[in-house]
Amino acid sequence: MEIVNFGIIGCGRIAGRHAIQIEKFGKLKAVCDIIPEKAKAMGLQYHCNWYTTVEELLQKEAGNIDVMAICSPNGLHKTHTIEALKAGCHVLCEKPLAISVNDCGEMIKQAENSNKRLFAIKQNRFNPPVAAVKKAIDEGRLGKIYSIQLSCFWNRNDDYYHNSWKGTADLDGGTLYTQFSHFIDLLYWMIGDIRNVACFTGNYAHQGIIDFEDTGVVILEFYNSAIGTINYTVNSYQSNMEGSLTIFGEKGTVKIGGQYLNELEYQKIQDYVIENLPEGNKANNYGSYVGSMSNHDKVYENLVDVLTKGVSINTNAFEALKTVEIIDKIYREAKKIK
């Protein structure tokens, strides 16, 4: 496989990030969206075939696509992933992998049955300060981890949800799935799996606009005995304020901050200094709102290397499943309090 051929299902905003990287690392053969104008526009822009149904895409492009990028609404990830896997494609699925634990399991099982790879997007892992702190933890520089604080203070105004699948229970799933699943992933990746949660959530500024919470406070207990809290909201006035992770350890304290975990704001580590961090990529800017750091280049570079050189996968589906399990655990606890 010299040139990796790609397809994209879903031509919304995030699909553009994928298309840019596909042009760098492979070839975009076809795109699909139920809104003809979106599919046609992307098809013309990237000189590829365009379709308005997944069925037609998979039928007419049979054998032409090596990897299908799933950029459709969260609640459709399972269906589109399984259809692409059954058609003989490897799959790269946008976050979250799905919005139920059972759906994730079915997707992983189908990938195994089809003997195909299922890649997940975990872009915040590639933020330079995040990668540096993860390395320090793995090397034991912070010693035993005592506690953590994850702060997610973003803004999503009414326009963000207007005439969109975003904000709906069936297709969006919740604020932790769409806005902050990358942040939850880092807790699992850097600190460990979570044993117990307690939480309070509420919809304070988006009543009648979204089907779920816009704010939450979560208390965590990890299996390794560390404890922590998550304080999240999309009600930061007018703009994103902060996306930060503070870690308190036996031998050090660090805070990764900025608006989207893009700055090493504080460090005090025994006999160790994190320095000379490379400049990270800019955040995904969608005009009316800003997302996480745009690290899709690193995701695609690894994906192509996995398929062409046999290197290890950086973001596998099992770890994406863990993120969904943690969010599911939080939401289940929140429902008990309602």
Label the model's feature ranges:
Residues 1, 56, 67-70, 223, ...:
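C-terminal helix-rich "cap/oligomerization" subdomain common to oxidoreductases
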Residues 1-46, 63, 336:
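N-terminal Rossmann-like dinucleotide-binding module
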Residues 18, 46-110:
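Beta-loop-alpha module in the N-terminal Rossmann-like domain of NAD(P)-dependent dehydrogenases
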Residues 52, 93, 118-120, 230, ...:
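Hydrophobic residues in well-ordered beta-strands that form the structural core
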Residues 106-123, 143-150:
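Rossmann-fold dehydrogenase core element
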Residues 124-209:
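Predominantly a Rossmann-like dinucleotide-binding segment in NAD(P)-dependent oxidoreductases
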Residues 178, 184-263, 297-310:
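Contiguous beta-strand/loop segments that form the cofactor/metal-binding neighborhood of enzyme cores
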Residues 287-301:
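Active-site loop of classical SDR/Rossmann-like NAD(P)-dependent oxidoreductases
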